[in-house]
Amino acid sequence: MDMKKIGFGLALCAVATVCAASSFANAAENKAEPLPKNSGFETPGANGNGAAEWNLYGNGMWRVKRGEGRNGTTALICDDVGKGGWTTQWVNVEPGRTYRVEGWVRTEGVEGGGVCIDFSWHDAYGSRAGTAATQPRVMGTTAWTKVSLEAFVPPAATKRCLIGTPVTGNTKGKAWFDDLRIVPLEQPPIGQFISNAYRNRAADGPVTFHVALGATKEEVAAKGLHGRFVVPSFAGVARNIAAEPDGADPSDVSATVDAASLPPGESKVVFELIDGKGKKVASKSLAFTRTAKPETKGVRIDRRGITHIDGKPFFPLGMFMWRATPEVIDHFSKGPFNCCMPYAAPTKAEMDYANSKGLKVIYDIHACYAGLKWATDRGITNEASEVAYVTQRVKEFRDHPALLAWYINDELGLDWIKRLAAHRDLCEQLDPNHPTWVAHYMVEDIRGHLPGFDVIGSDPYPICQTGDPPISQVMEHTRITRKGVFGARAMWQIPQAFDWGGYRVQDKDKTRPPTFDEMRNMAWQFIAEGANGLISYSYSSWEKMKWRTPVEEMWSRACRVGEEVKSKIPIFLSEEAAPKVTPITKDASVRAWRKDGKIWLLAVNPTYKPKVVEFAIEGFGLNRSVSLEPLGVWFGEIRE
């Protein structure tokens, strides 16, 4: 994950309070008080300064002025967007609902990152948990321009949300803002519809179809909602498979069929939502392809989430880095790792050298969305130039033996989903033999991002993070990630291997890097919660804080953790069906595998106190338990 997500700068921020939501609520204008208050900045603040309900910050660059608004009214003005600052207000919204955030922007001589309106929310620890921004950003000198975004505020969000206008520190120019609004939208009755088959293609074997309902459990009960999958068959007769929503959690309705029973080639599986009177409320279809034989060429993901390279199982174990130069690769290849993710897109010579050292490369094409500064630096100014850039890179490296995957998103929010999905689709079209991978810290949004990736990587970094979340945030976020993808997508998770002080310079005296025990514990938390790969952040970040912790020490910690994980990879990749294991103890992670007939169990204590971890194993008569030290990890064979 790119630390660029922290550096927004100028922000006009409003904080929102959230309560419960109705998924089928009318999206017409909310009869409640319009949001935000004083949206046109017409009412002056105390002593005639600023605007009532708003707090203005930022080096004296923010002011309000009558006659500068859209119709000669009042506008909020930032005289120098490059000097940053923000304006904030508290507002009230409901979690579990989608909102349209809109406003009007005028600019003069804006260069660099551009100007937009931003909306974000926080988690229970006070950290930003999700964000969205209007796209494309407003650049140059413009007349009043309406901008808008749509954002889903997850049910788990706290009562703090931000509405703002972030720009990067590299932006310059002047900007005006007027008439901001936050409007609730209607929740569609049927949400994401996917299968657990890689790219919805399979020749045989069980395939599970998953659908998310846009209804609360109360609405499911009150309206008698239920569903059915209409599945085509080899014989030409469609089958209706009843699917009842879980009364406790209707967010996943599923059905499993044998892929061999589907007609050859592409066909459509349909999900129909039915109410208690038998009336069809809504329907949605999914294109699925039954192939003539299993596809094994290149890099693919099986239905357990395990990666395969030309048919052989593979567990990605690597790190982010800045550039994969020969000097860096010489050093990195001496560790236990089998892949790397360099932000500076490698040259052919660098790819060749990585391959000669036995390393796979996740190729970075994430910074090519028009409107981002990094895209502008590459000469990308519109969506056509995005496509040209991605096409050129993919065609150049799609057949390279070092290529593992395409990295296409580094923390961009749901407001980018159409373009993220378009890039994923383009990568598949140009290169059907390698998956796309993304990094995403806004875990509550991941289900909405499903069209935009093949493999997900979420990246909780709890050690000395703002809000001081517990180290068990790794466990919590990975569980949310797994649920967000219906357990049907591979997770190459991203452990913290850096000191936050390298990115929050103002807090550097309050931060530290994770210890070896913490790095080890976080890695095993990820795996215990279902990770199919680990790509730590970041090999190159240690230089920033080497005055506190030597680079050699951080490298040693990363290698010790990596060696331990590497030693268990043959077990992770076993094709034998593993027994289901369920933690009984709160705040603990467990997972089981079966290899050569033996059952292997992983138990993790994600706390700084000793803990007895109790768990139940499918097929075992009695619950079992292991005693773990603070941050303890146990991995061993368990017998009936």
Segments predicted by a language model, with ranges:
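Bacterial N-terminal signal peptides that target proteins for export
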Residues: 1-14, 23
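Low-complexity, Ser/Thr/Pro-rich intrinsically disordered linker/stalk segments at domain junctions
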Residues: 157-158, 266, 613
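Surface-exposed, short loops/turns at beta-strand junctions within beta-sandwich domains
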Residues: 259-265
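Glycan-processing catalytic domains of CAZymes
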Residues: 200-217, 271-276, 280-640
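Extracellular and organelle-lumenal recognition/adhesion modules and their flexible linkers in secreted
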Residues: 26-252
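Hydrophobic core positions of the immunoglobulin-like beta-sandwich fold
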Residues: 90-91, 259, 617
